[in-house]
Swiss-Prot record:
Family matches, as Pfam families: 2OG-FeII_Oxy_3
Organism: Arabidopsis thaliana
Protein localization: Endoplasmic reticulum membrane
Residues involved in Fe cation binding: 169, 171, 251
Transmembrane residue ranges: 11-31
Cofactor entry: Fe(2+); L-ascorbate
Name of the molecule in the record: Prolyl 4-hydroxylase 13
């Protein structure tokens, strides 16, 4: 005859040991997050928008700790609060102001330089910045994205004044529009150099497949919106891992209603870029 009482006595210690084991694992994970300076509010989450109410974190230029939020998986967008210091942002603006020129955008078939000169921007190589600020920012971008720096284009520093916007577009190149491609833009990294009092959001109208019914007005400011806040950054993927363009990566800049918007963009290619 089997003794069920003895089996119950034997089962209890194993259950207790298993519980202790899982509690130990949880405790280790919690301690690991805590030791890296990551709070539960900073664990990647999906958000419909980001604005001034985002929890404020201490600014810092350290590259050892880069907190982030996952804003969306379609497209893959990540938000990095306080990525650069106020001093770094203002130094980049001061450097760029006297050098701004009409933007020279990549031209599609049928476009001319005259039709795209609505913005003023500056392409700046890190080795042309004697202060070392851009080099420090680029080093942090490399740690955040895990892409080698020889895949990077030069910084594109762009200023939006009152009423200026950037209609929805792709940073990746469609070969049908631009012709044969030598390389492709995999990632766009965008650093907000200034806060904007009203308007100026970076928006993704096709987030999670919304507005993709063929009737979307490319001048409308809809979808996932990220309000510019000085020192914060976002980066997003323009391509899927198989190299095809992510159609939901369509993005633009809403009109500036009050204030001025400064951004520094770093495009990252899929191979070494000169």
């Amino acid at each position: 005859m089997r003794s069920y009482g003895k089996e119950k006595k034997l089962v209890f210690p194993y259950v207790f040991i298993a519980c202790c084991f899982f509690l130990a694992i949880f405790g280790f994970c919690f301690f690991n997050l805590f030791s890296q300076g990551i709070s539960f509010s900073e664990i990647p989450t999906t958000r419909r928008s980001v604005n001034d109410e985002t929890d404020s974190l201490d600014h810092g230029s350290s590259v050892s700790n880069i907190p982030f939020h996952g804003l969306s998986w379609n497209p893959r967008v990540f938000y990095l609060p306080n990525f650069a210091t106020k001093q770094q942002c203002e130094a980049v603006i001061d450097m760029a102001k006297p050098k701004l020129k009409p933007s020279t955008l990549a031209l599609r078939k049928g476009e001319t330089a005259e039709t795209t000169q609505n913005y003023r921007s500056l392409h700046q190589h890190t080795d042309e910045d004697e202060s070392g600020v851009l080099a420090a920012i680029e080093e942090k971008i490399a740690l955040a994205t895990r892409f080698p720096k020889d895949y990077y284009e030069s910084f594109n520093i762009l200023r939006y004044q009152l009423g200026q916007k950037y209609d929805s577009h792709y940073d990746a190149f469609h070969s049908a529009e631009y012709g044969p491609l030598i390389s492709q833009r995999v990632v766009t990294f965008l650093l907000f150099l200034s806060s904007v009092e009203e308007g100026g959001e970076t928006m993704f109208p096709f987030e999670n497949g919304r507005n993709m019914n063929g009737r979307y007005d490319y001048e409308k400011c809809v979808g996932l919106k990220v309000k510019p806040r000085q020192g914060d950054a976002i980066f997003f993927y323009n391509l899927f891992p198989n190299g095809t363009i992510d159609q939901t990566s369509l993005h633009g800049s809403c009109p500036v209603i009050k204030g001025e918007k400064w951004v520094a963009t770093k495009w990252i290619r899929d191979q070494t870029y000169d």
